[in-house]
Every structure is written in C-alpha cells, then in structure tokens.
Amino acid sequence: MSLFDDGLEDLDRHPTHAHHPAQVIHDGPFVLEDGEPLQRTGMLVLSDEHLEHARAAIAPLAAHLAHAFLVFSEAGLLVHASVRGEQVYVTLAPDQFSTFVWSGPQAVFLGNVDGSGGVLDALKVDRRRTVFNVTFEVYGAFPARLLTRRAYFADAGVLATGPGSPSVACVYKHEFNDYCIMLPSRAPDVSLTLSRPQVAKLAAVAKGAAAGTTFALARGLDFSVSSSAGVVTFPARDRDGTAVLERASQRRQGVDAVGATEPFAMTLETAHGLLTLLQRLRAGNAELTFNFFTTPRQAPLFSVTTCGPVRATTFFFCAPADPATVPAAPEGAAATVAAACGAGASAAPAAGDKRPAAPRMYTPIAKRPRAASGEGGHAYGDLF
C-alpha cells in the first residue's frame, strides 16, 4: 500500500494538529449525526515537481495568504488574496496536481487558521523541515463541506539520508458559504512581456512618482511608463514571423507584444501596491507579462502575471488618459530599450467579430453552487 493511499492508518492515529479553539480536532472518520460517514467529494495532491511549481508561485506571496480565499472546483484551485489592497490570484489547473479528483459545485474555504498561520503555510519555504506532499481532501455536501489539509514532512536532511518516519500536520476547515468573487472573463487587448531588468526600470519610474503613473502605447508602437520622476520607453519595431523566429535564438533585449495596436493610455493613481507586488513577483521570475484591458475606455485596467507553470496574477484599476499627452523619453536615453514586437494582432478581434462596445469584464462566483451542467463556468487557466 502506498504511503498516500486511502489507508493512512498509522499517520491518522497520531496526527499533529493545529491547536486552536476554532479548529476541529479530529482523530477518526468524519460522520454525520446519524452515524453515516461523510463522502469524500474532492482530493487534490501536490508532490514532486507539481509541489515545487506551486511553491514557486505561492512562496513569494506567502506572508499575505493567511486570510486568502481558497476556491476548489472542477477547474482546479484558485487562491484569491489581497496585497496592499490589490487583488491577487494564484491558479492551479487540474493537470498541475499530482492527483486531482473533484465532484460537485465549487467550494470556498478561508485560509486562516490562527493569528499567525494558514492552510497554505505548507507551501512556504521551511529550512527546518522538508514538506514532500500536500493533500487537500473535501468531505460532505454543499453548503456544509469540510476541508482536510495534510502536509507530510520530514526534518531537513532526513529524506536525503534515507527513508524515515514522516510526520503529518493536519488542518480542518469548514466551508465558507457567504462570498462573491469577481473573476475576469475575457482576453486582454494588449499583452507585453518584460524582462526582469525592464521591470526594474518600470518600478524605478513608479517609485519616484509624486502623483500617478501612466502606461501608454503610442501609435508608433512605443510602450512607455511615465510619472513625475521620469519616463521609460520601450520602442517596438513591427516584424514578420520570420524575423521573430530568427530573433528567438538570440538574447532578447526588448518587449514582446501581442494584441491590438490601437494607441491607449491609462493612469494608475497610486503605485504603492504595484511596487510591493512587483518586488514579490520578480522573485524567481525572469519575466512578467503586463496585460492591458483598454475597453470600456472609461474604466481601463491592467494585470501583471508571472510566466511560470503556476501563475500568479494581480489587477490594477486605472483612470483613462490621453496618449497624445504622454511625454517621450529623451533621444538616446539610457532607459530606452530597443524592442521586437510580434507582427499581427493575435488577440485582436477577427474580421466580422461583433463584440459589444462594453464587454462584460467579470464573471462572478457567488455563494450558490454552479449548475451541474457547468454552464457559465470557466477554466482558471483561460481567465489568467
């Protein structure tokens, strides 16, 4: 029998629980009042490379995830948190788990355990012990399901020296059924991928801003970020597919862009949250993708997404601005970086596309379960 089969008798007899008055301390099968056992409706396991990918995405944000929402569904796991007032989403699709089994409507749980810990603490980097398996199990039926999170670990160095007796830390949480989370429901109009040095230059402009920070794409396809502290410009040259393929083998020095080429400008009133998140997301990520939603024009916004196997995404609401008023960087300025843009507009509407003038930006996840038919559902990977 495998260590992680259903028969975890030895580990279940003596689990290490999170001792807190609000927690369920349980040492046996979950049962209803009439004595019938609760049915397991979900099992999600992270181990090996799947665990490493999840840890790489979550660890930089771990300090802010104690009070996150955890949304389990047939689309995977969505972690929704707030950092400096900005909304952050980490998504894991079903194929990003070592084991994924789910039935029934989505289930939401609060990630907090006590004042200093949370359900996702098992994904933090811990030098004292090595976590090698994290298992989420959901029991019961809506709206009174129960989440069990088991983290299997050994003292640091034990796994490297040979087999030993692993320990398990268990946390139990009851379903949270009074919630509403808004998720983006359409593709961005323009996506720009910036390298870590380029993100550092962008952050320097935003950090010194006395007022707002403006992001703009000029008609000549020059992407710029400006504030009272200065301006950084990433000029783009339109290239055909052959040129892009030829350049792919070289060291990239510029911005890769995909999307419509209509000029736009939007102003982020305060960059405090952006700077904090850029600092967190740059850790372990060689590139970040900036996705700009330019319609409806009176309410633009952009998101920042990591480029790893497991992605973290954060959104920023902006005010509309006039591209003609955006200052240009001095000619030959050190901040100016030559860039290569992919030709075409793969994210632009196709010929004959009759999309509405003000498309619906968000899909709500409400407290009532989604219909069994799955209508109105989205895979998290399609949203971010």
UniProtKB/Swiss-Prot annotation:
The keyword DNA-binding applies. It is found in: Host nucleus. Keywords: DNA replication, DNA-binding, Host nucleus. SUPFAM superfamilies: DNA clamp. GO terms for cellular component: host cell nucleus. Gene3D superfamilies: 3.70.10.10. GO terms for biological process: DNA replication. Pfam families: Herpes_UL42. InterPro entries: DNA_clamp_sf, Herpes_UL42. It comes from the Viruses. GO terms for molecular function: DNA binding. Belongs to the herpesviridae DNA polymerase processivity factor family. Interacts with the DNA polymerase catalytic subunit. Interacts with the origin-binding protein. Plays an essential role in viral DNA replication by acting as the polymerase accessory subunit. Associates with the viral polymerase to increase its processivity and forms high-affinity direct interactions with DNA. Facilitates the origin-binding protein loading onto DNA thus increasing its ability to assemble into a functional complex capable of unwinding duplex DNA. This is DNA polymerase processivity factor. It comes from Suid herpesvirus 1 (strain Kaplan) (SuHV-1).
